[in-house]
């Protein structure tokens, strides 16, 4: 352990030693590890297969790690793990079809609070999720909220997508900002000056899973807006805070933002930032490694910062990824063993390390992992989880809040205001849509 730039740096060896002590080591594990240590023959018939559906990752190297691990597990157990990777926005549709048809992928890795919508087709995986959480320091509230529905674990938390603001340091300095703005009013001022110089801010408002929702939910919360009360039933979106955010955003759109953002998806702002078309964008750390490998000028000039504070504080909507085991799976025991196996710390760490701060593990054990301080420009991504909320806050995560997100109600509310609908009318529309869901 060393002290560097005022920060305690923990070596990987020190971290793993502490982690092993905390979890009791691998010797405490049963299941597949126990079988392999004992040299027992696999208990599954020849030709046994598991179908695993997941999104194409924005950090492709993580997919290779997982694919290699799936192949390793299959080889050891004499089974085949068939991994299918598709676009992230296509996963919910495929998952819904699997639940409806009672057939399809055995395991589905899915984002956000969608497990609540699909809970009827999911196996209770508490016997997998609970031991993992206990062994690894407990789950973050956000991770559990999006995977726990109706009093049971309908999915095993896998990761939380880190999200903050990517920006060009030199361009901000040119307009008088030597550090990223602390408040939304400062953000507006910065953006106005940047756009005047041909370097607008870029925000996505299309129907895409991550960035549009992250921005719109986060901005709403920063100004004190919420969808529902703590009871999870009473719709309270039509309040002063929401309206303030809804009035601010169209002004920022005209003054500060790239006006192509209405049709952007989660990859559009990445491309625009790397091309130098925009100066600032909210995103995961997926732009940074691409810049490092292919756009050295962008890489040297970019940095990351937390989201600005509003009157109510600083808050984030962070996408989560969870693993659902479907009821139609004929090999549920094997599927659970596979999930336990690749979520064990010695294998999960390899995936997490490869993700390079893109993903926050769902459990608290990893907070002091050295990956977070490997590059000072990425440290901000570790702490965004502290200010994260789930859709439907202050109520509990639920099927209703999942439906609201799936229908992009908040995103469309902001998009309507951008396109000229008076903010008051856009807010009334969104409130009415929420009331239909929560009725």
Language-model features: where?
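N-terminal secretory signal peptides
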Residues: 1-14
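Extracytoplasmic/periplasmic solute-binding protein
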Residues: 32, 149-158, 163, 188-235, ...
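Short, solvent-exposed loop/beta-turn-alpha elements that line the ligand-binding surface or hinge
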Residues: 43-45, 126-139, 207, 225-244, ...
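Conserved C-terminal helix/tail region of periplasmic/extracytoplasmic solute-binding proteins
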Residues: 44, 80-81, 120, 173, ...
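Long, aromatic- and glycine/proline-rich binding clefts that accommodate carbohydrate-like moieties
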Residues: 44, 49, 137-145, 302-305, ...
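Hinge/lid segment of periplasmic solute-binding proteins
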Residues: 44, 111-164, 188, 215, ...
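Extracytoplasmic "Venus flytrap"/periplasmic binding protein-like
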Residues: 68, 72-139, 148, 170-182, ...
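Glycine-centered hinge/linker elements that transmit conformational signals in sensory
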Residues: 190-193, 232-262, 307
């Amino acid at each position: 352990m060393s002290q560097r730039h005022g920060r305690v740096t923990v070596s990987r060896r020190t971290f793993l030693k502490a982690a092993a002590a905390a979890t009791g080591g691998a010797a405490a594990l049963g299941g597949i590890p126990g079988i392999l240590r004992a040299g027992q023959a696999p208990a599954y018939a020849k030709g046994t297969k598991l179908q695993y559906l997941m999104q194409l990752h924005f950090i492709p190297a993580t997919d290779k790690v997982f694919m290699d691990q799936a192949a390793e597990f299959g080889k050891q157990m004499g089974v085949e793990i068939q991994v299918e990777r598709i676009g992230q926005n296509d996963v919910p549709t495929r998952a819904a079809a699997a639940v409806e048809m009672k057939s399809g992928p055995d395991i589905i890795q899915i984002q956000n609070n969608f497990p609540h919508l699909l809970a009827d087709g999911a196996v209770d995986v508490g016997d997998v999720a609970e031991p993992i959480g206990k062994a690894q320091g407990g789950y973050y509230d956000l991770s559990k909220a999006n995977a726990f529905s109706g009093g049971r674990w309908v999915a095993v938390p896998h990761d939380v997508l880190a999200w903050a603001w990517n920006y060009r340091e030199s361009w901000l300095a040119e307009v008088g900002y030597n550090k990223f703005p602390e408040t939304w009013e400062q953000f507006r001022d910065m953006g106005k000056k940047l756009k005047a110089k041909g370097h607008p801010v870029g925000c996505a408002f299309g129907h895409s899973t991550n960035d549009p929702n992250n921005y719109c939910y986060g901005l709403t919360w920063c100004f004190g807006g919420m969808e529902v009360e703590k009871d999870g039933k009473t719709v309270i979106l039509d309040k002063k805070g929401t309206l303030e955010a809804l009035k601010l955003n169209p002004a920022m759109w005209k003054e500060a933002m790239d006006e192509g953002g209405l049709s952007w998806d989660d990859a559009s702002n990445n491309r625009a930032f790397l091309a130098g078309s925009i100066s600032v964008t909210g995103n995961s750390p997926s732009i940074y490694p691409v810049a490092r490998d292919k756009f050295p000028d962008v890489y040297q000039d970019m940095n990351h910062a937390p989201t600005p504070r509003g009157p109510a504080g600083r808050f984030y909507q962070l996408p989560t990824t969870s693993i659902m085991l479907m009821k139609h799976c004929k090999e549920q025991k094997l599927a659970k063993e596979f999930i336990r196996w690749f979520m064990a710390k010695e294998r999960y760490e390899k995936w997490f390390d490869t993700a390079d701060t893109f993903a926050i593990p769902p459990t608290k054990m990893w907070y002091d992992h050295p990956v977070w301080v490997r590059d000072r420009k990425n440290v901000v991504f570790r702490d965004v989880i502290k200010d994260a909320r789930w859709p439907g806050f202050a109520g509990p995560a639920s099927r209703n809040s999942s439906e609201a997100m799936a229908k992009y109600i908040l995103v469309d509310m902001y998009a309507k205001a951008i396109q000229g609908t008076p903010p008051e009318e856009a807010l009334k529309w969104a409130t009415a849509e929420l009331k239909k869901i929560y009725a």
